[in-house]
Design a protein with these regions (language model features):
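Sequence signature of WD/YWTD-type beta-propeller architectures
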Residues: 1-290
């Protein structure tokens, strides 16, 4: 819960992107869209463009560095989007901007997480223009940024881990800013002890003041957890702005101040994707035996 893709394994995956059809009929069909050319690479950080025709994702390049790639879903080969002539820079966790540029997380600061002696690289946010290779760093945080995504009002929502002079077990805060990096402000969780972490934040399509995200701990279960709908217009602190825990209805959300917040909690979720305000695609492990 303090690391990013730069700390993840770069071998032994047999990953590919597939298109599934026949979901309603039950006659499930599978078509391979992309298979990494680099042996053992995972394929992660999937982001669909607003036109529904292009998909951006992260995979290894030929030097086994993480790079952002894009594929046209109507046909064609994948292309590497991030092309920077620096042998030790990596890019991942990207999102499209409406003007054709993109945001991504990068190890551009060349710094590490203090409490693990720098062994996990810190990711900060960059602005990148694929048309000409222009690159600009937008955040200068001691610790990690995650999950940039464009909101309906044009601002960018993301998660920032605060560390300096704070109880850092409990300080992964949802932020928002302008796409050029100005006006970086807290959106949810500043000054709160619950939850420890909020990951995979995604705005709802119509009720644009709301977003969905996964709450998790600090140590313990990594990156997965409980699925919540948030409304910062109601409150921006602790459980007071959490309006529903999914898939439950009317279940009280009780704030707990503890390190391993979601150990032994079921179901567990990662990567929610709202289709509507009421319907979500999400990866789930429903029980310890799933």
């Amino acid at each position: 819960n303090w690391s990013n893709l730069s700390s993840a394994s770069r071998k032994n995956f047999k990953a590919e992107l597939v298109e599934l059809s026949g979901l309603k009929s039950g006659n499930l069909q599978e078509k391979t869209v992309y298979k990494p050319a680099v042996d053992g690479s995972s394929v992660t950080d999937l982001v669909l463009n607003w036109d529904g025709k292009r998909l951006m994702f992260t995979a290894l390049d030929t030097t086994r560095r993480w790079q952002v790639h894009e594929i046209n879903l109507e046909g064609g080969n994948a292309r590497q989007v991030t092309n920077i002539p620096e042998p030790d820079l990596e890019f991942f966790d990207a999102t499209y901007l409406p003007d054709g540029r993109m945001l991504a997380i990068s190890n551009i600061g060349y710094q590490g997480v203090p409490c693990v002696n720098g062994s996990d690289a810190v990711g900060n946010m960059v602005l990148y223009d694929p048309s000409n290779g222009d690159l600009r760093r937008l955040t200068f945080d001691q610790d990690a940024n995650w999950h940039p995504v464009v909101m309906a009002n044009g601002k960018v929502m993301y998660v920032r881990w605060e560390y300096t002079d704070l109880t850092h077990y409990f300080s992964r805060i949802v932020m928002h800013m302008n796409p050029d990096g100005t006006e970086q402000k807290s959106l949810y969780g500043s000054g709160s002890m619950f939850p420890n972490s909020i990951f995979d934040v995604q705005p709802l399509p119509k009720r644009t003041n709301r977003f969905v995200g996964v709450i998790s701990g600090h140590h313990g279960v990594a990156r997965s957890g409980r699925l919540m709908i948030f409304d910062p217009a109601k409150s921006r602190k602790e459980e007071k702005g959490m309006i529903q825990e999914l898939p439950f209805r009317g279940r009280p959300i009780i704030p707990e101040v503890k390190d391993e917040l979601v150990n032994g909690v079921w179901p567990q979720f990662i990567k929610p994707y709202p289709l509507t305000d009421e319907t979500f695609l999400v990866t789930a492990k429903l029980s310890p035996y799933s």
